[in-house]
Amino acid sequence: TGQRFSTGLKVMLRVSASMHPVYGFSLVVSDVNPEYTMGDLLRRRREILMRLKQEGILELNRMLPFPEVPQRIAVISARGAAGYGDFINQLYNNPSRLRFRTRLYPAVMQGVSAPSSIIAALERVMADAAMWDCVVIIRGGGATSDLSGFDTYELAANCAQFPIPIITGIGHERDDTVLDCVSHTRVKTCLLYTSPSPRD
């Protein structure tokens, strides 16, 4: 799965036992079942979505009014990320010659610190709330496990209740995260650059 071993991660392993006269008993891992781990990740994702639904906040951001063409855009992404650079290039060189104003609120977009870093970026956006029509959260493609930071309850609940519409451009077409499910509009990164307004 590409997922690093960490506390709470469930795995199914094939092991062989051995006894060494000096080092004692040991287990040697010969195989890992990735389907077992991915199944557990999907289960946790469903549990988070169910909790958000029970709390009545799952669709709050999706219900916010949205301008026909948002031109004042707060962007949350990693500084120097290729996805961010592509988005800005396409946005400012759009064929309709629309004018946009953007500002990057940098955040860590991968790993265990990603959720808290994105929440901190959202708090900075909130301090400038009157300036923005929407927030775009960009994270390009990668291994499915690299997107696990977008499947946490804390980040999802924060985004679901955020008072400005959030557009997510996370991963590839096949990738769906909890953050995608609570955002106003989800647009995969391959389409984000040509879609400044939500699609049905």
Model-predicted segments: where are they?
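Short, surface-exposed secondary-structure edge patches
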Residues: 2-5
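Nucleotide donor/acceptor-binding cores
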Residues: 71
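OB-fold and OB-like beta-barrel modules that bind single-stranded nucleic acids
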Residues: 8-19
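Preference for bulky hydrophobic residues occupying beta-strand positions
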Residues: 13-15, 27, 102
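OB-fold/S1-family single-stranded nucleic acid-binding modules
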Residues: 18-43
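Short glycine/threonine-rich loop/turn motifs
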Residues: 74-199
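Short N-terminal or domain-adjacent regulatory/targeting segments
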Residues: 38-67
